[in-house]
Amino acid sequence: MEIKLEHIEPKDIERQSMALIQQELDRRHIRLDAVEAPIVKRCIHTSADFDYAENLVFSANAVDRMRTSLRAGIAGSASADASAGGRSHDAGASGSSHADASTEAWVRDAGAIVVTDTEMARAGISKKAIAALGAETRCFMSDPDVAAEARARGVTRAVVSMEYAARIKDRPLIFAIGNAPTALIELYRLIHDRGLRPAGIIGVPVGFVNVVEAKELILSLAEETAPIGDIPWIVARGRKGGSNIAACIVNALLYGIDDVKR
């Protein structure tokens, strides 16, 4: 049997993959929302699964609102630069380095935090893009204190991890959940019982036990009144998902922000 391999330059592989994805979507007569399309296509590109064209659902303006939150560090940097500029004009060269440090601190303190439920998802998020926005990623799953508390209480580490993340104040929190449905269930509880107001929830855990139900809990937030009903989310309905899907959704959000390079 003769197998013919196509020669393609490395830099062109992703572009051609996306073109093939669009061809298949056209063949299936699937029309995606223009804003949501890059997110859906990246999920398909990551998984080779066209079901995401049907089962990936978005709350109203979820993409734009999450991108705005991811840009919080840029907004903080601009404000700090303006403030630092006035100080450095008076302080001279010695004041300039102090102003630079203040700017960096402002970005770090203002930037969004993407919280994942696996180190795999965290590792898959573009470090360059996150850093360019003054944002950061965190995963509490391997924290010894989280593991110890989870054992003592008889709950999953994902539950305790969400509680730890919810303690972070005054910074936009975007939760990217690709593995543990208990993380979504706990987020739902924290939203109702502890006043947690995430800047976004990416709910794409994969599996069988309580996976569908946990996702439906997040979808049900849209039925509530503000402010709970205003929490933006992106959810993969059904059993499909995974840490790779959670990471690729975050990356698709990042890559759609002006001036963000991979």
Which residues does each PLM region occupy?
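Electropositive, gly/pro-rich neighborhoods at or near active sites that engage anionic ligands
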Residues: 1-74, 106-108, 112-113
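Long, charge-dense
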Residues: 129-170
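Short glycine/serine/threonine-rich phosphate/pyrophosphate-binding segments
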Residues: 121-124, 181-187, 208-212, 242-246
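Intrinsically disordered, low-complexity terminal tails and inter-domain linkers enriched
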Residues: 71-110, 224-228
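C-terminal functional extensions of proteins
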Residues: 199, 209-262
